[in-house]
């Protein structure tokens, strides 16, 4: 009896999560027109560009190394900045906690179409333990790398907005065409 009840509850849970469109977060399905693109960055071997390249590859995007190609879309990583602000302090006035902010500016150039700007911001808090200076530095490096990976994931997910904005633009152009023809 207990086994049947467990099977029933498990089956209902699977049906409910599948029915509502829930999916485990995995790779992002990049639109077909962005399945092949040029990745352009001022620091092509830097940690942020490597993280973006890795996320694109995980999403089955073919990265072309020829930056002179004008017939395929181009993802340009324009700039990134890391800032660190004090969030709280100890009684003696030393910093107890930081908020680290990573901001990434990029743009996608579609051949023969518009330029689509993308911006990603990632926030993290970091506890500054003055008693463990070496461990603090190692932990801060790990947090920075996680922030870069998270920014790269968000950037790849934002590629979906380009497809959506192109569809809206195409719909607007198609609805404007019959209206203009009727006026003539």
UniProtKB/Swiss-Prot annotation:
UniProt keyword annotation of Lipoprotein present: yes
Keywords for this protein: Cell outer membrane, Lipoprotein, Membrane, Palmitate, Signal
UniProt GO molecular function: lipopolysaccharide binding
Localization terms from the record: Cell outer membrane
Lipidation (N-palmitoyl cysteine): 20
Gene3D superfamilies referenced in this protein's UniProt entry, alphabetically: Lipoprotein like domain
Topological relation to the membrane, as annotated: Lipid-anchor
Predominant location: membrane
Cited PROSITE patterns: PROKAR_LIPOPROTEIN
Lipidation (S-diacylglycerol cysteine): 20
Origin: domain of life: Bacteria
Residues making up the signal peptide according to the UniProt record: 1-19
GO biological process terms on file: Gram-negative-bacterium-type cell outer membrane assembly; lipopolysaccharide transport
GO cellular component terms, semicolon-separated: cell outer membrane; transporter complex
Pfam families, A to Z: LptE (PF04390)
Family: Belongs to the LptE lipoprotein family.
Function text: Together with LptD, is involved in the assembly of lipopolysaccharide (LPS) at the surface of the outer membrane. Required for the proper assembly of LptD. Binds LPS and may serve as the LPS recognition site at the outer membrane.
Assembly: Component of the lipopolysaccharide transport and assembly complex. Interacts with LptD.
Name of the molecule in the record: LPS-assembly lipoprotein LptE
Species in which this protein is naturally found: Pectobacterium atrosepticum (strain SCRI 1043 / ATCC BAA-672) (Erwinia carotovora subsp. atroseptica)
Lineage, top ranks: Bacteria, Pseudomonadati, Pseudomonadota, Gammaproteobacteria, Enterobacterales
Originating gene: lptE
